[in-house]
């Protein structure tokens, strides 16, 4: 939201008389020996305008950032905290691929959709999906330790997930949305199975450098998929794809 400031310059004696007559708020910008420069929020009739400035209003959501005070963290109510107990499973929120996936979930996931998280690791993306309003989230990983940690983190965040030690081919359900943050070579091994898991939209991440990106984009041409968005961060790539 923006508003305009109208800048004027008057002799001191004229300015103080203007204040008495105007009866509204002004912002004093500069007071010299002879002249005063001031701003008002509407144009004045009969006065020579010096400048018009566009002022951006900083909303509370833009200005308030989380504050760490010792062992306490102060958060505004519109943020959705995710609690992760650091373990051996991938996904603490520090890696660029995780950060990009979280951003895509924020921007491209629709409340009420069902979702599957392939290679769930710590469960951070699965938890984010539930916090964004998913009606059902299934999380899978081939690593039993990841499955254990994902379940523990779901409990820590008071969200309900279905967590399985499984491969994509083991899942006989389809979902509105899929997130797969995997090593690039895995996409070439299981893409046929991944495409069967979602009906509307998917996030493919874990792609490193442009050579891998080119290979993955070439792979996607073999399937009824359209790249909706491409995101990069620190050499890593994330693709948002829609079923067509």
Region annotations inferred by a language model:
Residues 33-37, 81, 201, 236-238:
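A generic structural signal for beta-strand entry/edge sites
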């Amino acid at each position: 939201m923006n508003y305009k400031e109208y800048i004027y310059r008057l002799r001191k004696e004229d300015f103080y008389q203007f204040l008495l007559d105007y009866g509204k708020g002004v912002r004093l910008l500069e007071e010299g020996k002879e002249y005063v420069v001031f701003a008002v929020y509407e144009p004045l009739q009969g006065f020579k305008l010096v400048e018009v400035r566009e002022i951006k209003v900083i909303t509370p959501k833009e200005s308030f950032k989380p504050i760490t005070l010792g062992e306490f963290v102060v958060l505004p109510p519109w943020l959705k905290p995710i609690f992760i107990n650091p373990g051996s499973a991938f996904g603490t929120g520090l890696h660029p691929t995780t950060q990009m996936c979280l951003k895509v979930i924020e921007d491209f996931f629709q409340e009420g959709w069902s979702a599957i998280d392939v290679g769930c690791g710590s469960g951070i993306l699965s938890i984010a999906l539930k916090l964004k309003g998913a009606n059902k989230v299934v999380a899978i990983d081939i690593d039993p330790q990841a499955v254990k940690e994902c379940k523990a983190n779901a409990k820590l965040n008071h969200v309900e997930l279905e967590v399985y030690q499984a491969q994509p081919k083991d899942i006989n359900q389809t979902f509105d949305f899929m997130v797969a943050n995997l090593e690039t070579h895995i996409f070439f091994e299981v893409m046929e199975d991944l495409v069967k898991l979602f009906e509307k939209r998917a996030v493919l991440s874990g792609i490193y450098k442009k050579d891998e990106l080119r290979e993955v984009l070439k792979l996607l041409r073999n399937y009824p998929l359209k790249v909706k968005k491409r995101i990069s961060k620190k050499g890593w790539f994330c693709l948002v794809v829609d079923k067509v």
